[in-house]
Amino acid sequence: MSEETKALNFIEHIIEEDLTNGLSKENLRFRFPPEPNGYLHIGHTKAIGVSFGLGEKYNAPVNLRFDDTNPAKEEQEYVDAIKRDIAWLGYKWESELYSSDYFQKLYDWAILMIKDSKAYVDSQSSDAMREQKGTPTEGGTNSPYRNRTVEDNLELFKGMKDGKFKAGEHVLRAKIDMSDPNMLMRDPLMYRVMYAHHHRTGDDWCIYPMYDWTHGESDYIEQISHSLCSLEFKPHRKLYNWFRDNIYEYAKNQLPLPPKQREFARLNLSYTIMSKRKLLRLVEEVVVTGWDDPRMPTISGLRRRGYTPNSIRQFIEKVGVAKRENVIDVSLLEFCIREDLNKSANRVMAVLEPIKVVITNYPEGKEEWLDAENNPEDENTGSRKVPFSREIYIEKADFKEEAGNKFFRLKLGGEVRLKNAYIIEANYVVKDAEGNVTEIHCTYSTDTEKRVKGTLHWVSVKHAITAEIREYNRLFIDEAPDSHKDKDLMEFINPNSLKTRMGYLEPSLSSAEIGDRFQFQRLGYFNVDNDSKPGALVFNKTVGLRDSWAKQKPKPQQNQQQKQPHQKRKAISVIQQLGKKYTNLPEEKQQKVKIEIQSLAKDVAYNELEALFGTAMKKAGTRVAVLIALKEHFKNGLERNENIDAFILKAKEDKNDVLVAEANEID
């Protein structure tokens, strides 16, 4: 999709308006300002994607600035991890900067604020200041120290800097308005005394600037044009502007561009918590093995689980930039990694719950090395050799002694195709003393052209290598584990979030290296974990081939009854039904419906879509659904024709914004 045809989000509209009103494109500059007090998580990727994405779109510099103003919680370990994660995602920053770079400049400006009676030293306790703050409906009370003389304030503030006072004895506050309806404007703190070793400045400072004072002024020093942050900071904008406007008077000759703060909805994900404090609790209480545990929503955890940078960037693009808070279904993130790995991951065979198959008419001691395609989505990946012998393993779940006509896997008297090999028929079984099947004795046929309905994966017993398999599931069983005020989030920990077993793998995997990703055919996507050692591979399950979580969730009986006829309808009919209300759905619901339409599109013939090209103008939702399905056909090689071009052009000229945006996504 070209930049010319892609619809602008509301932040891009703001930037375009600023450019139209005289802002030079050369003055565009953005930043990502993490606090180095923890590891980046999936929630941060939206802020990263927004700022760095704008940098890429406008060819503008993006600073990586560490907001390191609280030495009690910040460490170099987190700085290094943040840099590693952003680089892994594929983004490049213009300059690596730190708020601590500006400590002297901020201090000098604070002195000027005191001299202009815009700041004062308060000597009350934090409790007293809190009581004087007032409420959202009632104004606050002025501090008894609010009218200290400039001389006294300067002397006290310098004494704070020189370490003459205890922590909490004095603070510096901005002098604004204790009756302002916005409580953040009621004489906010600018500095506090803190005796803590800073990871960069050491013990040079014992006063540290507060977030609201540091944030905007750092933007101003760096000449950031657009300071982008999440919606929770929208009430802070008034204070951001107050500090900015006052400092601008001191420095406008050297720093001519005042920054602009704008807010967007942060990323909230179902079955996930985003609080660094609560994630730290999971680590400290050994619910997980560390910040990079594959069940953690940290970028390092996702990377270790097997997520790719491209899948996360695609996820952020699909989520989009919105003004309203919402919760994104984690299944969208899983969809993105499936889609990415489907294109890039080589197919291999692995058996996780084995049962032995003996092919009685295959010569003992004989072995063959059969050709197997690496990835049908990418012919450039070529093929590999897979060993076949008289004894193989298949999955226990792929065999039943007795089964109905709808069971297309192996059963007594039934035939299945072995992937890349022969067709076998189950003749009889061997059982142990408890009556459990231990072996299935089969015969094979070299007539591989025969039509059979089931195809199974397998590995040769003689050639299989073993590996530890870690199957991960969601860490929480509740969609919103952090939303229950009366319950501890630990009550919602999924006791089955990790299952470890030994698996049997085809021998080509013996050379797999840490980080390599594969599709274990019919099982899911897996990657080689960091814990792997030569001869002792460990694989993490990244995601299944389809969303199995939905099957595990208990559903009301009524919903189950309603779903049966829906599943039996033709795919094109379901797409039409999904499209009916599409344009009236909220963004999150639209995305879920879109994914469903994309999945159904493979079962729809082009002529079925073409029949809907004449859909009435007022049925915009149906036309959107047709466009979504068409795009899936384009991916599979459908060529454009006059009818398609006319349909797309008509959609681009429509009055419905959703329809126009969907049409504009097609080159």
Model-derived regions, located:
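Residue-level signal for inorganic ion chemistry
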Residues: 22, 51, 82, 113, ...
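Conserved short loop/turn motifs at secondary-structure junctions
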Residues: 33-36, 65-73, 95-104, 127, ...
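Active-site cores that bind ATP or allylic diphosphates and position pyrophosphate for catalysis
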Residues: 68-70, 76, 98, 112-279, ...
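Long, charged, mostly alpha-helical binding arms that flank functional sites
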Residues: 254-336
